[in-house]
Protein backbone atom coordinates (compact mmCIF):
# COMPACT_ATOMS: atom_id res chain seq x y z
CA UNK A 1 0.00 0.00 0.00
CA UNK A 2 2.97 2.33 0.56
CA UNK A 3 4.81 1.48 -2.69
CA UNK A 4 4.46 3.55 -5.88
CA UNK A 5 2.24 0.87 -7.44
CA UNK A 6 0.30 0.63 -4.20
CA UNK A 7 -0.37 4.37 -4.22
CA UNK A 8 -1.63 4.19 -7.81
CA UNK A 9 -3.90 1.29 -6.94
CA UNK A 10 -5.10 3.16 -3.86
CA UNK A 11 -6.39 5.94 -6.13
CA UNK A 12 -8.21 3.38 -8.28
CA UNK A 13 -9.59 1.88 -5.07
CA UNK A 14 -10.98 5.30 -4.15
CA UNK A 15 -12.59 5.55 -7.59
CA UNK A 16 -14.15 2.10 -7.21
CA UNK A 17 -15.49 2.79 -3.71
CA UNK A 18 -16.96 6.08 -4.95
CA UNK A 19 -18.71 4.24 -7.78
CA UNK A 20 -20.05 1.50 -5.49
CA UNK A 21 -21.44 4.07 -3.06
CA UNK A 22 -23.29 5.73 -5.96
CA UNK A 23 -24.88 2.53 -7.26
CA UNK A 24 -28.55 2.01 -6.31
CA UNK A 25 -29.15 -0.53 -3.54
CA UNK A 26 -30.94 -2.75 -6.05
CA UNK A 27 -27.50 -3.37 -7.64
CA UNK A 28 -25.67 -6.25 -5.95
CA UNK A 29 -22.39 -4.31 -6.35
CA UNK A 30 -23.67 -1.39 -4.27
CA UNK A 31 -21.27 -0.75 -1.36
CA UNK A 32 -23.79 -1.75 1.29
CA UNK A 33 -25.12 -4.71 -0.66
CA UNK A 34 -21.54 -5.98 -0.92
CA UNK A 35 -21.24 -5.71 2.87
CA UNK A 36 -24.31 -7.90 3.29
CA UNK A 37 -22.48 -10.78 1.56
CA UNK A 38 -20.17 -10.83 4.57
CA UNK A 39 -22.96 -10.48 7.12
CA UNK A 40 -24.92 -13.34 5.56
CA UNK A 41 -22.13 -15.79 4.77
CA UNK A 42 -18.73 -15.06 6.35
CA UNK A 43 -17.08 -17.79 8.46
CA UNK A 44 -14.97 -17.03 11.54
CA UNK A 45 -13.29 -19.38 13.97
CA UNK A 46 -13.19 -22.37 11.62
CA UNK A 47 -11.11 -23.83 8.80
CA UNK A 48 -13.13 -22.18 6.02
CA UNK A 49 -12.09 -18.68 7.15
CA UNK A 50 -9.18 -18.32 4.70
CA UNK A 51 -10.77 -19.74 1.54
CA UNK A 52 -14.12 -17.95 1.95
CA UNK A 53 -12.42 -14.59 2.35
CA UNK A 54 -10.17 -15.31 -0.66
CA UNK A 55 -13.27 -15.70 -2.82
CA UNK A 56 -14.86 -12.58 -1.33
CA UNK A 57 -11.70 -10.53 -1.99
CA UNK A 58 -11.21 -11.95 -5.48
CA UNK A 59 -14.65 -10.99 -6.77
CA UNK A 60 -14.42 -7.63 -5.03
CA UNK A 61 -11.11 -6.92 -6.78
CA UNK A 62 -12.69 -7.76 -10.15
CA UNK A 63 -15.59 -5.42 -9.35
CA UNK A 64 -13.11 -2.66 -8.49
CA UNK A 65 -11.39 -3.12 -11.87
CA UNK A 66 -14.72 -2.83 -13.63
CA UNK A 67 -16.00 0.22 -11.75
CA UNK A 68 -12.70 2.12 -11.48
CA UNK A 69 -11.96 1.80 -15.19
CA UNK A 70 -8.48 0.46 -14.36
CA UNK A 71 -8.14 -3.05 -15.86
CA UNK A 72 -4.77 -3.47 -14.13
CA UNK A 73 -6.06 -2.68 -10.63
CA UNK A 74 -4.68 -4.88 -7.85
CA UNK A 75 -6.06 -4.59 -4.33
CA UNK A 76 -3.36 -3.08 -2.07
CA UNK A 77 -2.57 -4.81 1.21
CA UNK A 78 -2.02 -3.13 4.56
CA UNK A 79 1.16 -4.60 6.04
CA UNK A 80 0.34 -3.80 9.65
CA UNK A 81 3.56 -5.48 10.80
CA UNK A 82 5.61 -2.84 8.99
CA UNK A 83 3.05 -0.07 9.57
CA UNK A 84 0.99 -0.69 12.73
CA UNK A 85 -1.23 2.34 12.19
CA UNK A 86 -3.98 3.47 9.84
CA UNK A 87 -2.21 5.41 7.10
CA UNK A 88 -3.16 9.00 6.09
CA UNK A 89 -5.01 8.16 2.81
CA UNK A 90 -7.62 6.35 4.91
CA UNK A 91 -8.63 9.62 6.59
CA UNK A 92 -10.39 12.61 5.05
CA UNK A 93 -11.09 10.81 1.75
CA UNK A 94 -13.79 8.55 0.34
CA UNK A 95 -12.06 5.79 2.33
CA UNK A 96 -13.10 7.45 5.60
CA UNK A 97 -16.63 6.32 6.64
CA UNK A 98 -16.70 8.87 9.48
CA UNK A 99 -16.02 12.03 7.53
CA UNK A 100 -17.18 11.39 3.96
CA UNK A 101 -20.73 12.50 3.13
CA UNK A 102 -21.05 9.62 0.66
CA UNK A 103 -21.83 7.16 3.49
CA UNK A 104 -25.21 6.51 5.11
CA UNK A 105 -25.13 8.66 8.26
CA UNK A 106 -27.30 6.81 10.78
CA UNK A 107 -29.54 3.85 11.56
CA UNK A 108 -32.73 5.57 10.46
CA UNK A 109 -31.38 6.32 6.98
CA UNK A 110 -29.84 2.86 6.81
CA UNK A 111 -33.25 1.33 7.41
CA UNK A 112 -34.97 3.70 4.98
CA UNK A 113 -32.48 2.98 2.20
CA UNK A 114 -31.54 -0.67 2.67
CA UNK A 115 -34.41 -2.60 4.29
CA UNK A 116 -36.63 -2.83 1.22
CA UNK A 117 -33.92 -3.94 -1.27
CA UNK A 118 -32.52 -6.47 1.21
CA UNK A 119 -36.04 -7.85 1.78
CA UNK A 120 -36.46 -8.18 -2.00
CA UNK A 121 -33.12 -9.99 -2.15
CA UNK A 122 -34.13 -12.29 0.70
CA UNK A 123 -37.34 -13.17 -1.14
CA UNK A 124 -35.27 -14.16 -4.19
CA UNK A 125 -32.98 -16.59 -2.32
CA UNK A 126 -32.87 -20.19 -3.47
CA UNK A 127 -33.82 -23.07 -1.14
CA UNK A 128 -30.10 -23.88 -0.77
CA UNK A 129 -29.34 -20.28 0.23
CA UNK A 130 -32.23 -20.21 2.69
CA UNK A 131 -30.93 -23.42 4.22
CA UNK A 132 -27.56 -21.74 4.75
CA UNK A 133 -29.25 -18.75 6.39
CA UNK A 134 -31.18 -21.03 8.73
CA UNK A 135 -27.92 -22.71 9.79
CA UNK A 136 -26.51 -19.25 10.45
CA UNK A 137 -29.33 -18.37 12.81
CA UNK A 138 -31.45 -16.39 10.35
CA UNK A 139 -34.65 -18.45 9.96
CA UNK A 140 -36.45 -15.46 8.48
CA UNK A 141 -35.80 -11.96 7.18
CA UNK A 142 -36.60 -10.32 10.50
CA UNK A 143 -33.74 -12.21 12.18
CA UNK A 144 -31.31 -11.09 9.48
CA UNK A 145 -32.48 -7.49 9.59
CA UNK A 146 -32.23 -7.36 13.38
CA UNK A 147 -28.59 -8.43 13.12
CA UNK A 148 -27.97 -5.94 10.32
CA UNK A 149 -29.27 -3.06 12.42
CA UNK A 150 -27.13 -4.20 15.36
CA UNK A 151 -24.05 -4.45 13.12
CA UNK A 152 -24.41 -1.00 11.55
CA UNK A 153 -22.67 2.02 13.08
CA UNK A 154 -23.78 5.63 12.98
CA UNK A 155 -21.31 7.80 11.12
CA UNK A 156 -19.62 9.53 14.09
CA UNK A 157 -18.80 6.08 15.52
CA UNK A 158 -18.04 4.27 12.26
CA UNK A 159 -14.32 3.98 13.03
CA UNK A 160 -12.59 4.19 16.40
CA UNK A 161 -9.10 5.17 15.20
CA UNK A 162 -8.69 8.71 13.95
CA UNK A 163 -6.16 10.84 12.10
CA UNK A 164 -5.11 12.18 15.52
CA UNK A 165 -4.97 8.66 17.01
CA UNK A 166 -4.13 6.31 14.11
CA UNK A 167 -1.98 3.72 15.90
CA UNK A 168 -3.13 0.20 16.71
CA UNK A 169 -3.41 -0.33 20.46
CA UNK A 170 -0.45 -1.97 22.26
CA UNK A 171 -2.01 -5.44 22.46
CA UNK A 172 -2.71 -5.33 18.74
CA UNK A 173 0.81 -4.14 17.97
CA UNK A 174 2.02 -7.29 19.73
CA UNK A 175 -0.49 -9.36 17.75
CA UNK A 176 0.91 -8.05 14.44
CA UNK A 177 4.61 -7.97 15.31
CA UNK A 178 7.01 -10.11 13.31
CA UNK A 179 7.39 -12.71 16.08
CA UNK A 180 3.63 -13.34 16.13
CA UNK A 181 3.47 -13.43 12.32
CA UNK A 182 6.31 -15.96 12.14
CA UNK A 183 4.54 -18.05 14.78
CA UNK A 184 1.33 -17.96 12.73
CA UNK A 185 3.24 -19.22 9.67
CA UNK A 186 5.19 -21.96 11.46
CA UNK A 187 2.56 -24.77 11.64
CA UNK A 188 2.92 -27.42 8.95
CA UNK A 189 -0.64 -28.78 8.80
CA UNK A 190 -3.63 -27.09 7.18
CA UNK A 191 -6.21 -27.75 9.91
CA UNK A 192 -6.87 -29.96 12.95
CA UNK A 193 -9.97 -31.01 14.86
CA UNK A 194 -10.85 -28.58 17.65
CA UNK A 195 -9.67 -30.89 20.43
CA UNK A 196 -6.64 -32.31 18.66
CA UNK A 197 -3.16 -31.72 20.11
CA UNK A 198 -0.66 -29.69 18.16
CA UNK A 199 -1.12 -26.62 16.04
CA UNK A 200 -2.39 -25.97 12.51
CA UNK A 201 -2.24 -22.94 10.24
CA UNK A 202 -6.01 -22.60 9.99
CA UNK A 203 -8.64 -22.43 12.69
CA UNK A 204 -10.18 -25.81 13.62
CA UNK A 205 -12.37 -28.18 11.64
CA UNK A 206 -16.08 -27.35 11.96
CA UNK A 207 -19.37 -28.88 10.81
CA UNK A 208 -20.34 -25.86 8.69
CA UNK A 209 -19.01 -22.40 7.92
CA UNK A 210 -22.34 -20.99 9.15
CA UNK A 211 -22.14 -22.15 12.77
CA UNK A 212 -20.58 -20.32 15.72
CA UNK A 213 -16.77 -20.34 15.99
CA UNK A 214 -15.11 -23.42 17.46
CA UNK A 215 -11.59 -22.00 17.85
CA UNK A 216 -9.05 -19.54 16.50
CA UNK A 217 -5.62 -20.16 14.98
CA UNK A 218 -2.80 -17.74 15.69
CA UNK A 219 -3.37 -16.03 12.33
CA UNK A 220 -7.10 -15.54 12.80
CA UNK A 221 -7.18 -15.01 16.55
CA UNK A 222 -4.22 -12.63 16.80
CA UNK A 223 -3.63 -10.26 13.84
CA UNK A 224 -7.05 -10.78 12.26
CA UNK A 225 -9.30 -10.35 15.30
CA UNK A 226 -7.09 -7.81 17.01
CA UNK A 227 -6.85 -5.44 14.03
CA UNK A 228 -10.61 -5.58 13.51
CA UNK A 229 -11.29 -4.63 17.12
CA UNK A 230 -8.52 -2.03 17.41
CA UNK A 231 -9.78 -0.18 14.33
CA UNK A 232 -13.47 -0.57 15.16
CA UNK A 233 -13.27 -0.18 18.93
CA UNK A 234 -13.43 -2.60 21.85
CA UNK A 235 -16.42 -1.08 23.60
CA UNK A 236 -19.81 0.35 22.67
CA UNK A 237 -20.67 2.16 20.53
CA UNK A 238 -18.78 -0.25 18.26
CA UNK A 239 -17.44 0.89 14.91
CA UNK A 240 -17.97 -0.95 11.65
CA UNK A 241 -14.77 -2.99 11.83
CA UNK A 242 -15.91 -4.55 15.13
CA UNK A 243 -19.06 -5.95 13.53
CA UNK A 244 -20.02 -8.40 10.79
CA UNK A 245 -20.82 -5.44 8.53
CA UNK A 246 -17.09 -4.65 8.75
CA UNK A 247 -16.70 -4.45 4.92
CA UNK A 248 -18.56 -1.12 5.09
CA UNK A 249 -15.23 0.33 6.27
CA UNK A 250 -12.83 0.33 3.28
CA UNK A 251 -9.99 -0.66 5.63
CA UNK A 252 -11.54 -4.14 5.71
CA UNK A 253 -10.32 -5.10 2.25
CA UNK A 254 -6.78 -3.79 2.81
CA UNK A 255 -6.65 -5.72 6.10
CA UNK A 256 -7.97 -8.96 4.64
CA UNK A 257 -5.72 -8.65 1.62
CA UNK A 258 -2.79 -8.93 4.02
CA UNK A 259 -4.35 -12.00 5.67
CA UNK A 260 -4.66 -13.58 2.23
CA UNK A 261 -1.05 -12.63 1.44
CA UNK A 262 0.11 -14.42 4.58
CA UNK A 263 -1.83 -17.51 3.51
CA UNK A 264 0.07 -17.33 0.23
CA UNK A 265 3.37 -17.03 2.15
CA UNK A 266 2.43 -20.10 4.21
CA UNK A 267 1.55 -22.02 1.04
CA UNK A 268 4.89 -21.22 -0.58
CA UNK A 269 6.69 -22.15 2.64
CA UNK A 270 4.94 -25.51 2.63
CA UNK A 271 5.87 -26.07 -1.00
CA UNK A 272 9.51 -25.25 -0.23
CA UNK A 273 9.44 -27.92 2.48
CA UNK A 274 7.66 -30.48 0.32
CA UNK A 275 4.63 -30.46 2.64
CA UNK A 276 0.88 -30.46 1.87
CA UNK A 277 -0.79 -27.08 1.33
CA UNK A 278 -4.42 -28.11 1.85
CA UNK A 279 -6.67 -30.49 3.75
CA UNK A 280 -5.68 -34.14 4.04
CA UNK A 281 -7.36 -36.68 1.76
CA UNK A 282 -9.67 -37.68 4.62
CA UNK A 283 -10.54 -34.04 5.34
CA UNK A 284 -11.27 -33.16 1.71
CA UNK A 285 -14.57 -35.02 1.66
CA UNK A 286 -15.87 -32.58 4.27
CA UNK A 287 -13.95 -29.45 3.29
CA UNK A 288 -14.21 -29.35 -0.50
CA UNK A 289 -18.01 -29.37 -1.04
CA UNK A 290 -18.82 -26.70 1.57
CA UNK A 291 -21.22 -24.35 -0.28
CA UNK A 292 -20.28 -20.71 -0.90
CA UNK A 293 -23.49 -19.39 -2.46
CA UNK A 294 -23.50 -15.61 -2.06
CA UNK A 295 -20.61 -14.20 -4.12
CA UNK A 296 -21.24 -11.59 -6.84
CA UNK A 297 -19.45 -11.13 -10.17
CA UNK A 298 -18.06 -7.84 -11.50
CA UNK A 299 -21.16 -7.46 -13.72
CA UNK A 300 -23.46 -7.74 -10.71
CA UNK A 301 -24.66 -11.28 -11.40
CA UNK A 302 -24.47 -14.08 -8.82
CA UNK A 303 -21.45 -16.36 -9.07
CA UNK A 304 -22.82 -19.70 -10.25
CA UNK A 305 -19.82 -21.63 -11.60
CA UNK A 306 -17.65 -21.74 -8.45
CA UNK A 307 -19.77 -22.43 -5.42
CA UNK A 308 -17.60 -24.81 -3.36
CA UNK A 309 -14.80 -24.22 -0.86
CA UNK A 310 -12.45 -26.30 -3.01
CA UNK A 311 -12.70 -23.65 -5.74
CA UNK A 312 -10.81 -21.16 -3.55
CA UNK A 313 -8.00 -23.22 -2.04
CA UNK A 314 -5.75 -21.80 -4.77
CA UNK A 315 -5.58 -18.28 -6.21
CA UNK A 316 -6.47 -19.86 -9.55
CA UNK A 317 -8.37 -17.74 -12.06
CA UNK A 318 -8.11 -14.64 -9.89
CA UNK A 319 -4.53 -14.66 -11.24
CA UNK A 320 -2.80 -12.38 -8.76
CA UNK A 321 0.39 -12.51 -6.76
CA UNK A 322 1.86 -10.34 -4.03
CA UNK A 323 4.82 -8.02 -3.73
CA UNK A 324 6.99 -9.24 -0.81
CA UNK A 325 5.96 -8.08 2.65
CA UNK A 326 6.47 -8.98 6.30
CA UNK A 327 6.78 -12.71 6.92
CA UNK A 328 8.28 -13.51 3.54
CA UNK A 329 11.55 -14.40 5.26
CA UNK A 330 10.09 -17.67 6.61
CA UNK A 331 10.44 -19.27 3.18
CA UNK A 332 14.27 -19.34 2.87
CA UNK A 333 14.60 -20.77 6.39
CA UNK A 334 11.70 -23.18 6.06
CA UNK A 335 14.00 -26.18 5.79
CA UNK A 336 16.17 -25.22 8.78
CA UNK A 337 16.39 -27.98 11.39
CA UNK A 338 13.27 -27.59 13.50
CA UNK A 339 12.73 -29.61 16.64
CA UNK A 340 9.99 -32.22 16.75
CA UNK A 341 6.88 -31.04 18.65
CA UNK A 342 6.74 -32.13 22.27
CA UNK A 343 3.74 -34.07 23.62
CA UNK A 344 0.96 -31.66 24.59
CA UNK A 345 0.90 -30.73 28.28
CA UNK A 346 -2.41 -30.26 30.07
CA UNK A 347 -2.77 -27.64 32.80
CA UNK A 348 -5.02 -28.37 35.78
CA UNK A 349 -7.75 -25.73 35.86
CA UNK A 350 -8.78 -24.51 39.31
CA UNK A 351 -12.20 -25.44 40.64
CA UNK A 352 -13.31 -21.80 40.57
CA UNK A 353 -12.65 -20.92 36.94
CA UNK A 354 -14.78 -17.82 36.37
CA UNK A 355 -12.89 -15.20 34.36
CA UNK A 356 -13.62 -11.68 35.61
CA UNK A 357 -12.12 -8.20 35.59
CA UNK A 358 -8.87 -8.32 37.60
CA UNK A 359 -10.08 -11.59 39.17
CA UNK A 360 -8.19 -14.34 37.36
CA UNK A 361 -9.17 -17.88 36.65
CA UNK A 362 -6.08 -20.00 37.14
CA UNK A 363 -4.55 -23.24 35.94
CA UNK A 364 -1.43 -25.07 37.08
CA UNK A 365 1.04 -26.76 34.72
CA UNK A 366 3.87 -29.03 35.80
CA UNK A 367 6.83 -28.25 33.56
CA UNK A 368 8.33 -31.17 31.66
CA UNK A 369 11.98 -31.48 30.70
CA UNK A 370 10.90 -31.49 27.06
CA UNK A 371 9.27 -28.07 27.52
CA UNK A 372 12.41 -26.69 29.16
CA UNK A 373 14.54 -28.05 26.32
CA UNK A 374 12.46 -26.61 23.45
CA UNK A 375 11.90 -23.29 25.22
CA UNK A 376 15.68 -22.84 25.42
CA UNK A 377 16.07 -23.21 21.65
CA UNK A 378 15.96 -20.29 19.19
CA UNK A 379 12.61 -19.60 17.55
CA UNK A 380 13.92 -20.84 14.20
CA UNK A 381 14.06 -24.31 15.76
CA UNK A 382 11.05 -24.36 18.08
CA UNK A 383 8.15 -22.20 19.19
CA UNK A 384 5.77 -22.77 22.07
CA UNK A 385 2.05 -22.11 22.28
CA UNK A 386 -0.82 -22.18 24.74
CA UNK A 387 -4.29 -23.17 23.58
CA UNK A 388 -6.74 -21.53 25.98
CA UNK A 389 -10.34 -22.79 25.95
CA UNK A 390 -13.19 -20.83 27.50
CA UNK A 391 -16.94 -21.15 27.77
CA UNK A 392 -17.94 -17.54 27.07
CA UNK A 393 -21.06 -15.67 28.13
CA UNK A 394 -23.76 -15.29 25.48
CA UNK A 395 -22.61 -11.79 24.54
CA UNK A 396 -18.86 -11.47 24.17
CA UNK A 397 -18.84 -7.80 23.17
CA UNK A 398 -16.20 -5.72 24.92
CA UNK A 399 -14.42 -8.69 26.51
CA UNK A 400 -10.65 -8.54 26.10
CA UNK A 401 -8.89 -11.54 27.69
CA UNK A 402 -5.32 -11.37 29.04
CA UNK A 403 -3.11 -14.37 29.84
CA UNK A 404 -0.26 -14.35 32.37
CA UNK A 405 2.35 -16.97 33.33
CA UNK A 406 4.21 -16.94 36.65
CA UNK A 407 6.00 -19.40 38.95
CA UNK A 408 3.80 -21.32 41.35
CA UNK A 409 3.04 -19.51 44.56
CA UNK A 410 3.76 -16.02 43.24
CA UNK A 411 1.15 -13.36 42.68
CA UNK A 412 1.07 -12.54 38.96
CA UNK A 413 1.50 -8.96 37.86
CA UNK A 414 -1.81 -8.46 36.00
CA UNK A 415 -0.36 -5.75 33.78
CA UNK A 416 0.05 -6.29 30.02
CA UNK A 417 3.27 -4.29 30.24
CA UNK A 418 4.53 -6.37 33.16
CA UNK A 419 6.94 -9.33 33.29
CA UNK A 420 4.26 -12.03 33.59
CA UNK A 421 2.21 -11.12 30.51
CA UNK A 422 2.01 -13.96 27.96
CA UNK A 423 -0.61 -12.86 25.44
CA UNK A 424 -4.20 -11.84 24.84
CA UNK A 425 -7.24 -12.62 22.73
CA UNK A 426 -10.70 -11.31 21.95
CA UNK A 427 -13.68 -12.23 19.82
CA UNK A 428 -14.43 -10.56 16.52
CA UNK A 429 -18.06 -10.05 15.54
CA UNK A 430 -19.56 -8.89 18.83
CA UNK A 431 -23.11 -9.72 17.75
CA UNK A 432 -22.36 -13.43 17.48
CA UNK A 433 -23.87 -15.32 20.38
CA UNK A 434 -21.25 -17.80 21.53
CA UNK A 435 -22.46 -20.58 23.78
CA UNK A 436 -20.06 -23.47 23.20
CA UNK A 437 -16.46 -23.70 24.34
CA UNK A 438 -14.07 -21.80 22.05
CA UNK A 439 -10.28 -22.12 21.94
CA UNK A 440 -7.73 -19.40 21.24
CA UNK A 441 -4.08 -20.11 20.47
CA UNK A 442 -1.38 -17.68 21.56
CA UNK A 443 2.41 -17.93 21.12
CA UNK A 444 4.16 -17.97 24.51
CA UNK A 445 7.83 -18.02 23.43
CA UNK A 446 8.65 -14.65 24.97
CA UNK A 447 6.94 -15.44 28.27
CA UNK A 448 8.88 -18.70 28.62
CA UNK A 449 12.11 -16.95 27.60
CA UNK A 450 11.64 -14.50 30.49
CA UNK A 451 11.14 -17.38 32.92
CA UNK A 452 14.31 -19.06 31.62
CA UNK A 453 16.30 -15.83 31.91
CA UNK A 454 15.13 -15.50 35.52
CA UNK A 455 15.90 -19.16 36.28
CA UNK A 456 12.22 -19.82 36.97
CA UNK A 457 11.38 -22.48 34.33
CA UNK A 458 12.47 -25.83 35.78
CA UNK A 459 11.47 -29.41 35.02
CA UNK A 460 9.15 -30.88 37.63
CA UNK A 461 8.17 -27.49 39.05
CA UNK A 462 4.74 -25.96 38.40
CA UNK A 463 3.97 -22.69 36.70
CA UNK A 464 0.65 -20.87 37.01
CA UNK A 465 -1.53 -19.51 34.23
CA UNK A 466 -3.92 -16.67 35.00
CA UNK A 467 -6.67 -15.52 32.61
CA UNK A 468 -8.48 -12.24 33.27
CA UNK A 469 -10.78 -9.80 31.53
CA UNK A 470 -8.96 -6.54 30.91
CA UNK A 471 -10.22 -3.23 32.21
CA UNK A 472 -9.76 -1.74 28.72
CA UNK A 473 -12.73 -2.42 26.50
CA UNK A 474 -14.83 -3.92 29.29
CA UNK A 475 -18.55 -3.57 29.70
CA UNK A 476 -20.18 -2.67 32.98
CA UNK A 477 -19.98 -5.89 34.98
CA UNK A 478 -23.66 -5.74 35.82
CA UNK A 479 -24.48 -6.08 32.13
CA UNK A 480 -22.80 -9.49 31.95
CA UNK A 481 -25.42 -12.26 32.22
CA UNK A 482 -22.65 -14.68 33.16
CA UNK A 483 -18.89 -14.65 33.42
CA UNK A 484 -16.66 -16.56 31.05
CA UNK A 485 -15.41 -19.90 32.35
CA UNK A 486 -11.89 -21.17 31.78
CA UNK A 487 -12.21 -24.83 30.78
CA UNK A 488 -8.79 -25.96 29.56
CA UNK A 489 -5.22 -24.90 28.79
CA UNK A 490 -2.87 -26.99 26.66
CA UNK A 491 0.79 -26.16 26.09
CA UNK A 492 2.86 -27.52 23.23
CA UNK A 493 5.52 -26.68 20.67
CA UNK A 494 5.68 -26.41 16.90
From Swiss-Prot:
Question: Residues that bind Cu cation B, according to the entry?
Answer: 224, 228, 256
In the record's cofactor note, how is the cofactor described as bound? Answer: Binds 2 copper ions per subunit.
Q: Where does Cu cation A bind?
A: 38, 53, 64
Q: Which cofactor does it need?
A: Cu(2+)
Instruction: Write down the EC number.
Output: 1.14.18.1
Source organism of this protein record: Rhizobium meliloti (Ensifer meliloti)
Mind listing the GO molecular function terms for this protein? metal ion binding; tyrosinase activity
Please give the name of this protein. Tyrosinase
Q: Which InterPro entries match?
A: Di-copper_centre_dom_sf, Tyrosinase/Hemocyanin, Tyrosinase_Cu-bd
Q: Which Pfam families match?
A: Tyrosinase
Q: Name its GO BP terms in alphabetical order.
A: melanin biosynthetic process
The record's annotation in PROSITE patterns points to: TYROSINASE_1 (PS00497), TYROSINASE_2 (PS00498)
Signal peptide residues on this chain, from the entry's feature table: none
